[in-house]
A protein has these predicted regions:
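Active-site neighborhoods and metal-handling regions in enzymes and metal-associated proteins
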Residues: 1-326
Length: 326
């Protein structure tokens, strides 16, 4: 997908950001509860039920349920699954697994969207490094989400953070996105590309930034369920995401319970202090989801699992065209 020049990036008022913050806090709370619930033996359907309960108790509704026919409240992607894993009573977690949970909520007509990856019990040190590298890349990208920068600065920061962390596969077929009155809107936010390119970032924009990386290659395959995306080589994956408001003071992380203070002390403290947020209990790293672009699969099975037989879309092209693009 290319970002077309005739498409508009939604600009929010400070009051609208306050309303997005309410939705973001629902997501942040739900993810914290889910991360605490992850344990050997629990099913991904159990986690989905917990998410539905927490979102409903807050007076919100799930962003994902029914979206293009998606059948669940969260995406629960285990091990080689990168994104869009459908919760199932038959998918139970085992010690050493890695699960990525993507969660979205709508409150008062505004969306929040985040994701995180956690280990189930003790995990392989290489898996822990994978999770740490992905989360670090998310925060490096968020640090560049500043009015006056270019969208490519965010993408490049994610890319270089992953590159510096090790030999990881950086997923290109799925991207972050603008967010606000709808879950997926302009602009697409790739996790790679040159700095100084793309739309000029302005105060009032909101971005969902969400790197996805693997311990192997970057190629992906969509399974026959039409949703679950897995690594083509069977390697494990991680996914982190946050919804970020661009303010004159810096990035305000709407899906972090402390607004981002713990991770972005130099910029986020200014932005969060301007909003009057107080730091709560230690935050849980939030998560990711991308617009529904489908990867290509030509075979009928992969690692014993049925996959989609034909392409249903195309990845973001990488040219950060758009309003004010260079």
């Amino acid at each position: 997908m290319r970002l077309r020049r005739d498409r508009v990036i939604e600009i929010k008022t400070p009051e609208q950001f306050d309303r997005m913050r309410e939705a973001g806090l629902v997501v942040a709370h739900t993810l914290r509860v889910l991360a605490e619930a992850v344990r050997p033996g629990i099913s991904t359907a159990d986690l989905d039920a917990i998410a539905a309960r927490e979102i409903g108790a807050a007076g919100a509704v799930p962003s994902f349920l029914g979206y293009f026919g998606y059948p669940a409240t969260i995406c629960a992607s285990v091990n080689e699954e990168i994104v869009h894993g459908i919760p199932s009573e038959n998918r139970r977690l085992h010690p050493g697994d890695v699960i990525s949970i993507d969660c979205g909520a709508i409150l008062g007509g505004w969306h929040g969207d985040a994701a995180l990856s956690v280990g189930v019990g003790e995990i392989d040190p290489a898996d822990r490094e994978l999770l740490d590298a992905c989360e670090a890349a998310l925060w490096q990208g968020i640090a560049q989400a500043v009015p006056g920068h270019r969208l490519g600065d965010v993408s490049h920061a994610v890319q270089e953070s992953v590159r510096a962390a090790g030999d990881y596969g950086l997923i290109r077929e799925y991207t972050g996105h603008g967010i606000g009155t709808t879950m997926h809107m302009e602009p697409p936010v790739p996790n790679y590309g040159p700095p100084g390119r793309g739309p000029l970032l302005r105060s009032g924009m909101a971005l969902a930034i969400e790197p996805m990386i693997t311990r192997g290659g970057r190629h992906t395959v969509e399974l026959a369920d039409g949703w679950t995306v897995v690594t083509a080589d069977g390697s494990r994956a991680a996914h982190f995401e946050h919804t970020v408001a661009l303010t004159p003071e810096g990035p305000w992380v709407l899906t972090a319970e402390d607004g981002g203070k713990s991770y972005l002390p130099e910029r986020a403290v200014l932005a969060v202090s301007a909003r009057g947020d107080a730091p709560p209990e230690p935050p849980v790293s939030p998560l990711q989801r991308s617009p529904k672009h489908h990867a290509t699969g030509r075979a009928t099975a992969l690692h014993g699992r049925e996959i989609a037989a034909s392409p249903r879309g195309a990845p973001y092209a990488g040219d950060l065209d758009g309003p004010d693009a260079r």
